[in-house]
From Swiss-Prot:
One of its GO terms (molecular function) is RNA binding. GO terms for cellular component: U2 snRNP. InterPro entries: Nucleotide-bd_a/b_plait_sf, RBD_domain_sf, RRM_dom, RRT5_SRSF_SR, SF3B6_RRM. Pfam families: RRM_1. This is Splicing factor 3B subunit 6-like protein. One of its GO terms (biological process) is mRNA cis splicing, via spliceosome. Residues 9-22 are annotated as: Interaction with pre-mRNA branch site. Residues 12-87 form the RRM domain. It is found in: Nucleus. PANTHER family: RNA RECOGNITION MOTIF RRM DOMAIN CONTAINING PROTEIN (PTHR23003).
């Protein structure tokens, strides 16, 4: 399928959630590499990002096939959640997170809680 006929939100970068915290990059390459050449995999390594990853494919068609096949796939006793990366959504989520942290700080100050 030519790139011009692919839905605009479909791209070569996938965002994966609900991964086992024990998964390795090698296991990710083995799983996602079944659907085409993978350029890069970034596993979340902080408390907030553990269990997530970004997978970058060489081309959009391979990413699309992986997204279709692996969404809901049971891997390491976890059902994977696979989405196309959306930079606009990432921006909004980050802003919401900052607002939630600010609200949490206000509540902590109000009740004198220190963590």
């Amino acid at each position: 399928m030519p790139p011009s006929t692919v839905n605009q939100e479909v791209n070569s970068i996938l965002f994966i959630k609900n991964l086992s915290f024990k998964i390795t990059a090698e296991e990710m390459y083995d799983l996602f590499g079944r659907y085409g050449p993978v350029r890069q995999i970034r596993l979340g390594n902080t408390v907030q990002t553990r269990g997530t990853a970004f997978v970058v494919y060489e081309n959009v068609q391979d990413a699309r096939r992986a997204c279709e096949k692996l969404s809901g796939y049971n891997f390491m006793d976890r059902y994977l959640v696979v989405h196309y990366y959306n930079p606009e959504r990432a921006k909004v989520d980050g802003q919401d997170l900052a607002a939630r942290y600010a609200a949490l700080e206000q509540v902590k100050q109000k009740y004198g809680v220190q963590l």
